[in-house]
C-alpha cells in the first residue's frame, strides 16, 4: 500500500474500554468532558455513571452544564461555565456561531481547532468501525485536509420574508430550530458568495414574489456561480428584470425552479457552463446545479487522487465504479485502467456521465485516450449475487455510496463467499458463478461512518476481506460530518 501513515492524534485504541463512571474528586456539579459524539457534543459522566451530552463543551474540559432533557441513563445539557479550558478551544471565525439565541446551525465545531476536529472525526470513524462492525483497520490513513474557510461551493439557503421583523432572511437554519438565522456573512461560503447575502436579502425584499420564494440553492464551479431560485408562483416580468440586474451586478447565473427538480432551467440561455477540473488527470467535469457534486472542490481533487493511488489500477485491470454519479471517479480511472464500468441508480446521472466521458474523450491529447467505459443504470440497493456475477469479473472496485451505504452490494459479495466455503444457510449460486472471482481490492469512500462500519463488518467477517487502511476526509470543516475512506483487500 502506498500513502498510509499513522495519524499522531488518535486518543486511544478504539477496542479498549471507556470509563463507566465519572470523576468523584471534582467540586459538586462539575463534569469532566472525555470525548465528543457524532453531533459534536461533549460527552461526560456523572459520578453514578450517567452519560451527559453537553452542547459547546470540548474534550478534557471541566465544565458546569444546565440539563434540558433527561432519560434514565443519559441527559442532554448546555454549557454554562468552563472551569478548565481545553487548549484546543479557539475563537469562532463567524459572528453567527455559538450557543446564543438565534445562532446559526450550519456549523457545530468552530470553537475547536481544526486539527483537533480532524482527530475527533478520526476517533468517530474508528469507534464506529469497531463497535458497529468489529473491524479495526490495519493502518490509519493520513487525513485529507484543506482550507477551513471559504470551502463550501454548494449550499441550500432558506429564504423567508418575516413581516414581524420587517426583513427578508437568507441563510441556514438556527441551531435546533426551523427558524432561519439572521445572517449577514458566512465565512464557510466562498468570499464572493458570503458578500452576496445582504444583497440577496435586499433583492428578495424588492420582489413581488418575496413571499413565495422559499429557497436559493448555490452551486459554484471553477469559474461560474449559479443560483437556483425556488418560486411557488410564476414570476412577474418586473421580478425577472430584478434577477437579471442582480446577475449583471454580481456576476452570477440565475436558474429557476417553479416545481420539482426536473423543472430547473436557466433564466436566460447561453453563457458559460458550470464545470470543475481534476487537473491530476486532465479531466473537466461539466455539471448542472442540480447534479450531485462534492461540496468542497479542493478536498475532492485530493480525494480523487488519493483514492486512485490506493486503488492502484493498471493497464491490465478492469474496474467497476459503483454509485458513479457524474463520473467523478470513473473518468480518472479511465486514464489508468484497461476498462472501467460506471454503475449508478439514476438514469439521468448515467446519461450525464456518458456525456462527460464523450466530451473528455474528444478533448484528450493525441495518444492519451481514455480507456473504454460503460455506464449502466441499476438499483444498487437491490443487488443479488446473480446480478453481481452478471457484471463480470472486475479486478478492483471503487465504491462511493450515499449515506445509506452499500449494504446490498456487500451482502451479495458475502453471500457468494459464504456459498463457496460451504457455510450453512448460504444461498445456492448460479452456474455462471464458476470462474467468477471477487475483486482483489476495494476502495470505499463513505459519507456516513455508521453505514461504512456495517458494510465493513460484512466484507471482513463474511466476504473474505481484510481492512488494510482507513482514514478521514475533512470535507466539511467546522461541522460534525465525517467523510472517510477505507481500503479492503481479499484474504
From Swiss-Prot:
Keyword field = 4Fe-4S, Iron, Iron-sulfur, Metal-binding, Methyltransferase, rRNA processing, S-adenosyl-L-methionine, Transferase
Q: Which residues form the active site?
A: 447
The residue stretches assigned to a coiled coil in this entry are: none
EC number, as in UniProt: 2.1.1.190
Q: Which PROSITE patterns match?
A: SAM_MT_RNA_M5U, TRMA_2
Chain sites annotated for binding S-adenosyl-L-methionine: 294, 323, 328, 344, 379, 400
Principal EC category:
transferase
Composition-biased stretches, type Basic and acidic residues, lie in 1-10
- Keyword Zinc in the entry? The reply is no
- Which stretch is the leader sequence? none
Q: Does the keyword Glycoprotein apply?
A: no
Region annotation (Disordered) ranges: 1-28
Which intervals hold domain TRAM?
Answer: 18-81
Name its GO BP terms in alphabetical order. Answer: rRNA base methylation
Residue positions annotated to bind [4Fe-4S] cluster are 94, 104, 107, 186
Pfam families per UniProt? tRNA_U5-meth_tr
Catalytic reaction annotation: uridine(1939) in 23S rRNA + S-adenosyl-L-methionine = 5-methyluridine(1939) in 23S rRNA + S-adenosyl-L-homocysteine + H(+)
Q: Which GO terms describe its molecular function?
A: 4 iron, 4 sulfur cluster binding; iron ion binding; RNA binding; rRNA (uridine-C5-)-methyltransferase activity
* Family per similarity comment: Belongs to the class I-like SAM-binding methyltransferase superfamily. RNA M5U methyltransferase family. RlmD subfamily.
What role is this protein assigned?
Answer: Catalyzes the formation of 5-methyl-uridine at position 1939 (m5U1939) in 23S rRNA.
**Protein name per UniProt:** 23S rRNA (uracil(1939)-C(5))-methyltransferase RlmD
Q: Which gene encodes it?
A: rlmD
Amino acid at each position: 500500500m502506498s500513502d498510509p501513515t499513522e495519524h499522531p492524534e488518535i486518543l486511544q485504541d478504539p477496542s479498549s474500554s471507556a470509563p463507566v463512571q465519572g470523576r468523584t474528586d471534582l467540586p459538586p456539579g462539575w463534569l469532566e468532558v472525555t470525548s465528543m459524539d457524532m453531533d459534536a457534543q461533549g460527552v461526560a459522566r456523572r459520578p453514578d455513571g450517567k452519560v451527559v451530552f453537553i452542547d459547546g463543551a470540548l474534550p478534557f474540559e471541566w465544565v458546569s452544564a444546565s440539563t434540558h432533557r433527561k432519560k434514565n441513563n443519559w441527559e442532554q445539557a448546555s454549557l454554562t461555565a468552563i472551569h478548565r479550558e481545553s487548549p484546543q478551544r479557539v475563537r469562532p471565525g463567524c459572528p453567527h456561531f455559538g450557543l446564543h439565541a438565534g445562532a446559526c446551525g450550519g456549523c457545530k465545531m468552530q470553537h475547536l481547532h481544526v486539527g483537533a476536529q480532524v482527530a475527533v472525526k478520526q476517533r468517530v470513524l474508528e469507534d464506529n468501525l469497531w463497535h458497529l462492525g468489529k473491524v479495526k483497520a490495519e493502518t490509519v490513513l493520513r487525513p485529507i485536509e484543506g482550507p477551513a474557510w471559504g470551502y463550501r461551493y454548494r449550499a441550500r439557503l432558506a429564504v423567508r420574508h418575516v413581516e414581524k421583523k420587517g426583513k427578508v432572511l437568507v441563510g441556514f437554519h438556527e441551531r435546533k430550530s426551523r427558524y432561519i438565522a439572521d445572517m449577514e456573512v458566512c465565512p464557510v461560503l466562498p468570499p464572493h458568495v458570503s458578500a452576496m447575502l445582504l444583497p440577496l436579502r435586499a433583492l428578495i425584499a424588492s420582489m413581488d414574489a418575496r413571499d413565495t420564494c422559499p429557497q436559493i440553492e448555490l452551486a459554484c464551479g471553477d469559474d461560474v456561480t449559479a443560483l437556483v431560485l425556488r418560486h411557488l408562483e410564476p414570476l412577474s416580468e418586473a421580478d425577472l428584470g430584478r434577477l437579471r440586474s442582480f446577475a449583471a451586478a454580481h456576476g452570477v447565473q440565475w436558474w429557476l425552479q417553479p416545481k420539482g427538480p426536473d423543472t430547473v432551467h436557466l433564466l436566460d440561455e447561453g453563457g458559460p457552463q458550470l464545470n470543475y477540473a481534476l487537473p491530476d488527470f486532465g479531466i473537466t467535469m461539466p455539471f448542472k446545479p442540480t447534479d450531485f457534486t462534492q461540496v468542497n472542490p479542493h478536498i475532492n481533487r485530493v480525494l480523487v487522487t488519493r483514492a486512485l493511488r490506493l486503488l492502484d489500477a493498471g493497464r491490465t485491470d478492469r474496474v467497476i465504479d459503483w454509485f458513479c454519479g457524474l463520473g467523478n471517479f470513473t473518468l480518472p480511472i479511465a486514464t489508468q485502467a484497461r476498462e472501467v464500468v460506471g454503475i449508478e441508480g439514476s438514469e439521468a446521472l448515467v446519461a450525464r456521465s456518458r456525456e462527460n466521458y464523450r466530451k473528455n474523450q474528444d478533448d484528450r491529447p493525441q495518444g492519451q485516450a481514455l480507456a473504454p467505459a460503460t455506464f449502466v443504470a441499476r438499483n444498487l440497493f437491490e443487488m443479488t449475487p446473480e446480478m453481481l456475477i452478471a457484471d463480470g469479473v472486475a479486478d478492483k472496485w471503487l465504491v462511493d455510496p450515499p449515506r445509506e451505504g452499500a449494504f446490498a452490494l456487500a451482502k451479495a459479495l458475502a453471500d457468494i463467499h459464504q456459498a463457496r466455503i460451504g457455510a450453512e444457510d448460504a444461498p445456492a449460486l448460479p452456474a455462471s458463478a464458476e470462474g467468477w472471482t471477487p475483486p482483489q481490492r476495494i476502495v470505499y469512500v463513505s459519507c456516513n461512518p455508521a453505514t461504512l462500519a456495517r458494510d465493513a463488518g460484512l466484507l471482513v467477517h463474511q466476504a473474505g476481506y481484510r481492512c488494510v487502511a482507513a482514514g478521514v476526509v475533512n470535507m466539511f470543516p467546522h461541522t460534525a460530518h465525517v467523510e472517510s475512506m477505507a481500503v479492503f483487500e481479499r484474504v
